[in-house]
């Protein structure tokens, strides 16, 4: 495999992508974490059972990974790239950054 390609997105970029519908935010935290609270409009796809072939898709939306603080989301990028997918974006601050900024939680 070649070198890992990662693009860090910040809170404003994630909010913009969710608002304009251009982004599908894939939360790779565990189900109990997702159930306890998640970013509105994000979808759950836990890293513990991560299957790049089973990633959700939405017409016209790019996949961006998110986790608690930007560690597991980078691992998800690595797994996706190892599977041949050209996915490289993640929310660097993750759910902790979202909550700290006072954003709404689902």
PLM regions and their residue ranges:
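Short, surface-exposed ligand- or partner-binding patches at beta-edge/loop junctions that are enriched
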Residues: 66
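Rhodanese-like catalytic fold shared by cysteine-dependent sulfurtransferases
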Residues: 1-24, 30-62, 71-106
């Amino acid at each position: 495999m070649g070198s890992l390609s990662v693009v860090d997105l910040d809170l404003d970029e994630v909010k913009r992508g969710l608002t304009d519908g251009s982004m599908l935010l894939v939360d790779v935290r565990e189900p109990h974490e997702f159930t306890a609270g998640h970013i509105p409009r994000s979808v759950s796809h836990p890293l513990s059972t991560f299957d790049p072939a089973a990633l959700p898709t939405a017409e016209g939306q790019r996949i961006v990974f998110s986790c608690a603080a930007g560690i597991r989301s980078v691992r998800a990028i690595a797994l996706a790239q190892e599977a041949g997918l050209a996915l490289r974006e993640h929310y660097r601050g993750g759910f902790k950054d979202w909550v700290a900024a006072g954003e709404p939680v689902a």
